[in-house]
Amino acid sequence: GLNLMLDPSFFIQQTERLSGTIVLVVSDEENVFFQEKYPVDILAFDQWGGIQVLPELLSAFVVPNHPVLTGVLSRASSILKEWSGNSSLDAYQSCNPNRVKLQLAALYEAIKEQHIAYCTPPSSFGDAGQRVRLSDNVLSGKLGTCLDLSLLYASCAEAMGLHPLLVIIQGHAFVGCWLIDGTFPDAVNDDPSLLTKRTADGINEVILLEATCMTDGNNVTFDTA
C-alpha cells in the first residue's frame, strides 16, 4: 500500500481552514500511466467539520483526561458531600439512576460556579461546522457557546466515569448523559425516538441538559435545565 508521510507539526499550526489538492501520479521514468487530482480541506486544530462529514469527530473535543478539569471535579465532589454526605464520584457503581443524577447535578453546580459567560461562536472563514473552544480555554477565558459548554460538561462527566451524549440540532447543541450503565451501539444516531424513549417518564435511562443554563447570571436549576 501507499504510505503517506504526514507532518503533525504542520497540522497543529493551522489556525484557519485550508483548501488544497492531493495529486496522485502513477508513472515510470518515461511514461505517466495515471494522474488524478483530489480536493482536500484541512481544518484548524480547533475546528469541527459539522454534521455533513464524519460528525462523530466532534467527540475528539471531549477531553476527560485534561488536568484543567480537576478543580471542577473536586468542587463537584464537595457539593455532592454537602447534599448527600457522600463525596464519591462513583459513576454507576450504585446501580441507582438517582445517584447518577445527583452526581450530574453536582457537576452542573460546579460549572455554574465558574461564572462562564455565553458568547457567539468564534469567527471562522469556513462555512461548515464550527470553531470550538476547548475545555481549558472555556475555563480560563470564562466564555463559551452552547457547543463549548456541552463539550465541557461531557468532558467532566466522562472523567467521572459516566457516559455523556452530545445532541446537535439546527443551530444549537446540548448535552445529555446515561443514568444507567449503557451506551448506544453506534457512534452517531439521527433517530430522535432513540432519545425520547429513554427520557420518557417512567423510563429515565437518559437525561438531557441545556448547557447554556450553566452560564453566569443564569438562575436555572439543574432539574429545570
Predicted regions and their residues:
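Intrinsically disordered, low-complexity Pro/Gly/Ser/Thr-rich segments with frequent PxxP/GP/PP motifs
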Residues: 1-37
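Amphipathic alpha-helical scaffolding segments
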Residues: 20-22, 39-43, 170-173
